[in-house]
A protein has these predicted regions:
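Periplasmic polypeptide-binding modules associated with outer-membrane biogenesis and secretion
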Residues: 1-217, 226, 240-260, 378-381, ...
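Transmembrane beta-strand segments that form the barrel wall of outer-membrane beta-barrel proteins
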Residues: 153, 186, 206-217, 223-246, ...
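C-terminal outer-membrane beta-barrel translocator/porin domains of Gram-negative envelope proteins
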Residues: 175, 190, 208, 216, ...
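Repeated loop/turn-to-beta-strand initiation elements of outer-membrane beta-barrel proteins
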Residues: 179-180, 207-209, 220, 232-239, ...
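Solvent-exposed loop/turn segments connecting transmembrane beta-strands
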Residues: 214-222, 241-252, 279-286, 333, ...
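Transmembrane beta-barrel architecture of outer-membrane proteins
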Residues: 221, 250-252, 274-278, 285-291, ...
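Outer-membrane beta-barrel "beta-signal"
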Residues: 227, 340, 513-517, 538-549
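Transmembrane beta-barrel wall of Gram-negative outer-membrane proteins
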Residues: 252-333
Length: 549
């Protein structure tokens, strides 16, 4: 364990330019109650280095190394990181393979400049001895099928031996998360110019059972039960059962995922679920049963595309006489068929700076129901995250938006957009947007458009680090607007019957505390609405907790 901690420290500092970092000594002291140890690491950081000049050289005829310059993802002056260099070598090796060039090694040659504390990098293209993969041996997998491990290798018996590809395969095996330890090594074969790849794995428990407790202003108290298996029947498949019960909603889901459908880089997902709500935002109840198969595949190293179909049986009921007529007219059952896709991009897989990340999700659904009813629903989410000031301060930004385009019929309140407290802080759930102010219960109608931007920073407070308390400040701005039917309870043709569905910007500022406790993370937010309308539902305090055991 101490050796592992030393490695973590070394990786942490070297990834931030401290190439001379070393652990000078470690000491262990027994606590007063003799129940634990205090570990002290005496370290020496050394100087921080940055990237200097970058060059390419080649001893191979007919190979122009300068053509690979466009692949560079770092610039002189960036903080040096061996991880960035390794990622750069992988990119160049991938390009070499695309050109069908075998037995070429890319060697990063590093020259240190002590005066300005920079490291000059030369990527040297050299001819490597021709070797081939003789065979791949796998052992230690008592539960997991051989093919689950073997399909992580892009190289098969008889292919040219590529050390980088073998390292990448080992990383993919570890990323499965079903083995406690993975060791991949190579040795010479009896055959000329051939190597044997040995894979030794250590099985670990892959099933889990969890019970959780949650509380938020929106949903009140709630409980969750989750059972999951990440290596179902040793096939590398994922199976889970989730049950969630809240004060005004209950849902149950069964999920199945086959990550290599038909032995291809194609993930097959199956989801079966049911959700019921009881006067969640207005005085009506809903019941939805759905089945959703999907296929996902990578478009690049950083992005995936999911194609999905969903069948849902949806029922809306109400016993209230005070419900808005704009909602009351939508009571009944519908069977909905939906075709859609989800595009997902995450830059953390391939970024120069480990302290920043950009992700994006974009989806569209085309839904068709009975009785001339259909719509197209579009949603997008952009996230950006960065740590500054020696990684002690975190800054994040988020932009979420959506549009409901009704093709046939009138839009329903359950299909329109509403905001939740965690999405638009400073307002209650469905606290902004079009509202039937002429109904007794002041029912929120939702909107066919929504957009919310959030900017947040969290930082350490002047308390001991072991208390695990951080402060946060944030700014939220957004709106929900647009209806294809603005008729309220009084009727569209009567005075006061129209619903205001125009775009009105709302904004809030706030500060809060985040506390990681033994029972789970607690969050306290204090907010003030800067811009709001008279009929909005603001709130000045929000508390949430999530606990698993």
């Amino acid at each position: 364990r101490v050796r592992f901690d030393k490695k973590v420290l070394r990786d942490f500092y070297s990834d931030r330019g401290f190439v001379d970092f070393e652990v000078i000594s470690t000491t262990a002291e027994l606590s007063r109650d003799r129940g634990s140890y205090f570990m002290t690491f005496n370290i020496q950081e050394g100087e921080q280095y940055r990237f200097g000049k970058v060059s390419f050289s080649s001893a191979i005829i007919d190979l122009d190394p300068k053509s690979f310059k466009t692949l560079l993802k770092f610039k002189p002056g960036n903080i040096y990181s061996p991880r960035v260099v390794d990622n750069q070598v992988k990119k160049i090796e991938n390009k070499v393979r695309e050109l069908n060039l075998d037995f070429i090694a890319i060697i990063p040659q590093i020259a240190r400049n002590e005066e300005d504390r920079t490291l000059n990098i030369n990527f040297s293209f050299e001819k490597s001895p021709p070797n081939y993969v003789d065979r791949i041996n796998i052992k230690g997998n008592r539960v997991t099928r051989d093919y689950v491990i073997r399909r992580q290798f892009k190289s098969v018996e008889g292919d040219p031996f590529n050390p980088s590809e073998i390292r990448n395969s080992a990383a993919r095996i570890r990323a499965l998360g079903i083995f406690g330890d993975v060791n991949v090594s190579t040795r010479a074969s009896n055959k000329v110019s051939s190597v044997i790849v040995d894979v030794e794995v250590e099985e670990q428990p892959t099933g889990s059972f969890g019970i959780g407790f949650t509380y938020s202003n929106d949903e009140g108290p709630g409980g969750t039960i989750k059972l999951s298996e990440r290596n179902f029947l040793g096939r590398g498949q994922f199976l889970s059962f989730d049950l969630t019960s809240l004060s005004d909603a209950n849902q149950v889901h069964i999920n199945f995922l086959e990550p290599q459908f038909l032995n291809r880089n194609l993930a097959l997902g199956l989801k079966l679920g049911s959700k019921t709500t009881s006067e969640q935002f207005s005085k009506y109840d809903s019941e939805v049963t759905e089945f959703e198969p999907s296929l996902s595949f990578p478009l690049s190293q950083k992005s995936t595309l999911k194609l999905k179909y969903r069948f849902s049986d949806e029922t809306l009921t109400s016993k209230s006489t005070a419900l808005s007529s704009a909602i009351l007219s939508q009571m009944g059952s519908k069977k909905i068929n939906t075709l859609g896709y989800v595009y997902d991009l995450d830059s953390k897989i391939d970024t120069i700076d480990p302290n920043e990340n950009l992700s994006m999700k974009f989806s569209q659904d085309y839904s068709v129901g009975d009785s001339n009813f259909s719509y197209i629903k579009t949603k997008g989410l952009f996230r950006s995250h960065k740590t500054v000031f020696r990684e002690e301060v975190s800054i994040s930004a988020k932009l979420a938006f959506g549009h409901l385009a009704q093709v046939e019929g009138k839009s329903r309140v359950v299909d329109r957009f509403k905001t939740y407290t965690r999405q638009m802080r400073g307002f209650k759930g469905a606290g902004i947007g079009p509202r039937d102010r002429h109904s007794t219960s002041q029912d929120p109608l939702g909107g066919q458009y929504f957009a919310v931007a959030q900017l947040e920073s969290d930082f350490p407070l002047m308390v001991p680090e072991e208390y695990k308390v951080r402060g946060t400040i944030f700014l939220d701005a957004g709106s929900v607007w647009g209806l294809d039917d603005r008729g309220g309870t009084s009727g569209v043709n009567q005075p006061g019957g129209l619903v205001d569905d125009k775009f009105h910007l709302r904004s809030t500022v706030g500060a809060g505390l985040m506390w990681r406790t033994p029972i789970g993370p607690l969050r306290f937010d204090f907010t003030k609405a800067i811009k709001k309308l008279s009929y909005d539902k603001p709130e000045s305090f929000n508390f949430s907790i999530s606990s698993k055991f």
